[in-house]
Amino acid sequence: PGISPAHEVDGRDLGGRIATAVSHLPHEQREVFLMRMQGDLPFKEIAKIQETSINTALARMQYALAKLRDELKADYRDIAGGQP
């Protein structure tokens, strides 16, 4: 059967919203997020690249995920007409 055109458009739109939200992250958080999610790098390697501790790299990822969650939740509420 495959994916319906409406679902395909929704998927692209969601991808665009995610990309926009990622672009709003502070540089260091965005860098950690992308190295981990796109580059599949371990946190030990990310910490080495950023010349910081593993704990700092982990914290940056946690902050990035929290900010993305908040921004995307707000997007979802706007789309759903104010519903959570």
Spans of features found by a protein language model:
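Acidic, proline/glycine-rich intrinsically disordered inter-domain spacer in sigma factors
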Residues: 1-23
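ABC transporter NBD signature
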Residues: 26
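DNA-recognition helix of helix-turn-helix
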Residues: 29, 44, 50-74
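A short pre-motif secondary-structure segment
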Residues: 32-36
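Flexible coil/turn residues that form the inter-helical turn or adjacent wing/linker of helix-turn-helix
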Residues: 39-40
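Short, basic, alpha-helical segments at the C-terminal edge of helix-turn-helix-like DNA-binding modules
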Residues: 73-84
